[in-house]
Amino acid sequence: YLKSRGVTRNTSSFYMRNLRSAYKLAVQENLTIDRQPFHCVYTGVDKTKKRAISIPDIRKIKSADLSHRPALDFARDMLMFSFYTRGMSFVDMAYLCKKDVASGYIIYRRRKTGQKLSIALVPEMQAIICKYQNSTQYLLPIITKEDGTERQQYRNQLIRINRHLKKIGTMTGISIPLSTGQRIFPVGGNGQL
C-alpha cells in the first residue's frame, strides 16, 4: 500500500516500526495473540545520498529578484539565514529567542540533541534579523503568536516555506529540490559567499 502511494523505503520503514511497536504493546497487554506479523517486514534504514546546494546556486538564490513576492522573499531569507548559521535546522530557527543573541553571537541549544552551540553573528544574519523585527520573544517571525499554538505555527510555516523554496528553485533553474531540510553548508565552507 505505502509503495503504491509513492512513499520511500525509509518512510515506509518508519511507519512499520511504529506499527510494530504498537502491536508489541498490544501483545504485552494481552489484547491480541502474538502471530508475529512483522516477521518478514523490513524495518531497517537505507543510507540516502545527501545533496548539498552549491555555492553558485546559493548565489543565484540570494540574487533572485523577489521584491514583488513577499512570501518567496521570506522563504529565501529563512534559507539564507540557515546558510549563514552553518546549516541551522528550521526548528531551531523557529524557536530562537531574542535573548539567544548576545555579544555578537547566537548561543542556543539544538532542540533535537540538546547540544549547546555558539555562532558568530555576521552582518548578513543581522540584516535578516533587523528586517523581521517583531514583538514576540522569538528572533524570527516563524512563530508569530505566543498563545499555545507555537508548535502548529512552526509546522504550518515549515510546509509553507518548503513550498515556496521549491518555487524559488524552479525560478532560478536549480536542479536540486530546495527545502528547509536541504544540506546548504558545503563541507569545508564557512558560510561566506
Regions found by a protein language model. Give the residues of each.
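C-terminal catalytic core of tyrosine-transesterase DNA break-rejoin enzymes
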Residues: 80, 84, 88-92, 184-193
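Short, basic (Lys/Arg/His-rich) helix/loop patches that form interaction surfaces
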Residues: 63, 67-70, 162-193
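Short, contiguous acidic/charged loop-to-helix segments that flank catalytic cores in large enzymes
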Residues: 66-69, 107-117, 148-157, 175-179
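DNA breakage-rejoining catalytic core of tyrosine-based enzymes
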Residues: 45-63, 115-122, 137
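Conserved tyrosine-mediated DNA breakage-rejoining catalytic core shared by Y-recombinases
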Residues: 40, 95-131
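Short, charged phosphate-coordinating catalytic segments
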Residues: 24-33, 82-103
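N-terminal core-binding DNA-recognition domain of tyrosine recombinases/integrases
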Residues: 1-49, 64-67
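Active-site/catalytic core of tyrosine-dependent DNA strand-transfer enzymes
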Residues: 58, 122-175
